Amino acid sequence: MLSNFEQLIFVGGVPRSGTTLMRAILDAHPDVRCGGETMLLPSFLTWQAGWRTDWVNNSGITQEVFDDAVSAFITEIIAKHGELAPRLCNKDPYTALWLPTIQRLYPNSKFILMIRDARAVIHSMIERKVPVAGYNTSDEQSMFVKWNQEIRKMLFQCNNAPGQCIKVYYERLIQKPEEEIQRITNFLDLQYSQQMLHHHELIGAEVDLNDQEFSASQVKNSINTKALTSWFDCFSEDTLRKLDDVAPFLSVLGYDTSSSKPDYSMFADDDFYQFRNFYS
């Protein structure tokens, strides 16, 4: 069995934020294996939190014992979810809500938090009929409120894990893939591989796809910018007018909420990260 000190890689974020693309890119690296979503670990992390009570401690099961049991389960799932590799990776979007727990269980792990314009995220959920708990597709504005709640918590946790969590903007990744992938591999202490720019050519070989993942069909294509503007003209004027109220973290993250057709070229600027402060 692998130890708790393995340099595991976790990829998370609000669903439809580019997590599947990110894990496909990582899977293309010769030393990394992610595989598809387990669709289990976020629920398991929620379950284990409910058992961390005084009742458990009073029964003689200390947090250390409980942590060992929890990490043993998670490690087995990740390790036997596919072929072994020098660096193992997990992509379940909502693990991003459990970063402090992951930090404690796996002190040498690294986390990639994917960030994407909420308008594109929510349009994707609605258009592709992706069922995500807590998102009511018949009420657009409530979906923006839910996104804001989740990304706020994810960002807070990521910002409290310096050196262990990196934020990756989807809009930059697809416009400046080589620079961004090099930034990511540096963070992960991996040697950069040109294969990562061509993940689509390795589908079925280095990169296994899970047909249950809603983005599986999309990542069969090369990295492209087609999805950047797919949400244009898809929201009501009333919804767009209220964005700063229902999803204030859009502007905090640098997205232009004043335009119904924003220009994403700023995310490709060479000095982009110089202007990312607490939330970047």
Curated annotation (Swiss-Prot):
Q: Which InterPro entries match?
A: P-loop_NTPase (IPR027417), TPST-like (IPR026634)
Gene Ontology CC terms, in alphabetical order = Golgi apparatus
GO MF entries: protein-tyrosine sulfotransferase activity
Residues binding 3'-phosphoadenylyl sulfate are: 16-20, 116, 124, 128, 170, 215-224
EC numbers, comma separated: 2.8.2.20
Site (described: Transition state stabilizer): 91, 215
Where on this protein are sugars attached? 57, 136
- Keywords of the record: Disulfide bond, Glycoprotein, Transferase
The residues responsible for catalysis, as annotated, are: 37
What reaction is this protein's catalytic activity?
Answer: L-tyrosyl-[protein] + 3'-phosphoadenylyl sulfate = O-sulfo-L-tyrosine-[protein] + adenosine 3',5'-bisphosphate + H(+)
Disulfide bond residue pairs: 34-89, 158-165
Keyword Glycosyltransferase tagged: no
Instruction: Give yes or no: UniProt keyword Transferase.
Output: yes
Q: Which family does the record assign?
A: Belongs to the protein sulfotransferase family.
Q: What does this protein do?
A: Catalyzes the O-sulfation of tyrosine residues within acidic motifs of polypeptides, using 3'-phosphoadenylyl sulfate (PAPS) as cosubstrate.
Name-wise, this protein is: Putative protein-tyrosine sulfotransferase
What gene is this protein translated from?
tpst-2
